[in-house]
């Protein structure tokens, strides 16, 4: 535990300088959207609560709480006909829990325009799709402390150029021992910069001043490198009410990104009979705001549980984001 905390502190100390130098300058922004309606409906304040399959996106340490194989799918409808698809699977094994995750940020077909054809009269189209694939491992280090790690491969693609890299997430949760009070932290998207390469950046330099020389000179435009959206998140969760069939859970997280000012996210979840849920939250990240959602969970048969969830995210300038998710454990 001491080693993990030391790593977290070293990275945290370096983040303020990075944030000032790269304000608004990181790439792979699709990684910031997270996944799973429960966590999103509470404003993304999930780093301490992290007790379900959604933990694979926010704090891998939370996967250690899973006691059965679990599969989850999430569909998000964003602005400009963009879709965000998330899929995750986790199962107890190897003395802990192993998880797999995939994220797809899909633009759909867009009309190709060029300097010569600025209205796209050719009718040609292209896509801008981003993907991330993760492998996670989490385990209970003590009866109070969990730790987890995710390694992921990231690929951003625009037509015939792409930028590929890798990153990892590191997290932990700690049960204080006072009621249901729990603390959590996560460092996400720590990895090398991305840089676009590909066919659309290739050209023939030629010798325009010497037309008599008929020779191709292949060359490439070199794109500028851009950093990952590095994030340090520290949170707390506590059950304000836990009586009979009623439970009210509060969550509060502080965010320290490398490309925005520090902010916070917060949320509440009311659960009845551990089967029906109503959620509300606030996402303090730039241009975001109120969030909300509903959920239900039921036993399909002996040992098989299924959950369906919905979330709504307001946006200051763009259309609201709606997500739907389904998960099953067996």
Regions found by a protein language model. Name each.
Residues 51, 67, 82-83, 131:
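Short, basic and Ser/Thr-rich N-terminal targeting/leader segments
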Residues 18-67:
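Outer-membrane beta-barrel biogenesis signature
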Residues 20-40, 84-330:
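Outer-membrane beta-barrel porins/channels
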Residues 4-15:
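Sec-dependent N-terminal signal peptides
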Residues 44-47, 69-79:
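Short strand-turn segments of transmembrane beta-barrel domains in outer membranes
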